[in-house]
Structures are given as structure tokens and as C-alpha cells.
Amino acid sequence: MNERVKSKARPDPTSDREEGGAFDPKFGADGLATCVTVDASRGDVLMVAHMNEAALRATLATGIVHYWSRSRGALWRKGDTSGQTQTLVEMRVDCDQDAFLAFVTVAGDGGACHTGRRSCFYRRVQTDGDTARLAFIEPSTLNGDSETDRQHVDCKATPD
């Protein structure tokens, strides 16, 4: 009878981060981690933004989602100017704790995008092999400008 012997090898140091119960987020060299924000009731992706440690702490402490604005170089409490405050329902972290998934409810008009739309993902990339074209997929914007939704933007799929 040949029995398998379990190895007593030293455990992988990433196993606690990947399989353990300790929340130990890993931020990139720029101090940021990606956050995908999802409508908690519908499951739609609303936006993708970034969090630094301060934004994450503020989000968890207040229940209102905060991000790090790369363009302004400042902490950003979503909704301060637009009224589209995002209340955290649930926060998830990916396997190696360097990306977050925030399930939220949105106050105000329910929008998340600075363009006035509910989601930042309102265009589909279509291609015929050589040329990529952006087609608007959301039937209307929150401000009712459906003409904007019918416009298309052309670009080359590959660099010249």
C-alpha cells in the first residue's frame, strides 16, 4: 500500500492575502487601486475609478463612496457637486486584493457619469476589421438629449 505523504513545505506568503480573512489591500506603485462601481439593485456597471488608501478609508468609515481623482490630484467624494452621491451597499475585493468592486445606490438623478448618463459605459466598440466605430447603446441620457445618443465617432482600430 502506497500512501501519499502531505508536504510540510512552507506556505505560500500570498495565500493569506488570497485565501485568508484579513483585509489587506494592495495599492500600486502610484498608490492607487482600481474600483469598479456597480448599481446594487440592477447589477449594471456604472463606472470605473481609482481609490487610494485615504479614499478607501473614507468610504469604509462613512458608507459614502470616495475616489482619488487622478486629474485633480485630490480626494473626491462622489456626488459633492452633482448630487449623485453613491452609498456603499457592499464592497468586494479581488483575489489578490488590488481591485475593488463597490455595489452602490445612487442619490439624485441616479447618474454616475459626468456626461449626465447613468453609466460611463454608454458606447459599444464595433469594428469591421480595419476601422473601429463607437456606437451609443443607452437609449437616452439623463438630461434627455437623445440626439447625442445617435452620434457615432470613428477611429482607426490599428495605428497608421
Which stretches of residues belong to each language-model region?
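C-terminal binding/interaction regions
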Residues: 3-32, 38-46, 51-160
